[in-house]
């Protein structure tokens, strides 16, 4: 299996989660400002909600790299506790990309909300999420 990890972040919360997932998968987590250099079977894509909205650059990244992505696995951080999975799934399907049925989300710190998150417990959960998917895929 060929994996990649890409993320969009403003605060650094999603980057922390992405780096931990990348560690499990043996790949470097990359900001979505960078194109995917090659085709991947599974792209773990991290994004965030800002004032209950996703950033449009995530959608543009998916469109631009659609030919290099087999399946997207979504993960997200948010001060509100909500997930970006529904949005990412819609973007994936619109571009003919499969969407993995399970996603990961954890709280992210923002101003007075969720200070210190994601914490070590959250990052361990992210690593376990990636390990479980690898195991399910027989990798």
Give the predicted meaning of each segment.
Residues 32-35:
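Short, polar loop motifs at secondary-structure junctions
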Residues 3, 9, 13-28, 39-139:
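FMN-binding flavodoxin-like domain, especially the glycine-rich phosphate-binding loop
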């Amino acid at each position: 299996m060929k994996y990649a990890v890409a993320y969009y972040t403003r605060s650094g919360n999603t980057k922390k989660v992405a780096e931990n997932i990348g560690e499990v998968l043996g790949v470097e987590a990359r900001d979505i400002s960078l194109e995917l250099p090659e085709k991947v079977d599974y792209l773990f894509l991290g994004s965030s909600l800002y004032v209950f909205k996703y950033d449009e650059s995530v959608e543009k990244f998916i469109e631009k790299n659609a030919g290099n992505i087999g399946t997207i696995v979504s993960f997200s951080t948010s001060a509100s506790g909500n997930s970006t999975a529904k949005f990412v799934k819609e973007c994936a399907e619109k571009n003919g990309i499969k969407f993995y049925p399970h996603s990961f989300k954890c709280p992210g710190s923002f101003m007075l909300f969720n200070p210190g998150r994601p914490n070590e417990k959250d990052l361990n959960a992210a690593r376990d999420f990636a390990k479980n998917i690898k195991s399910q895929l027989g990798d």
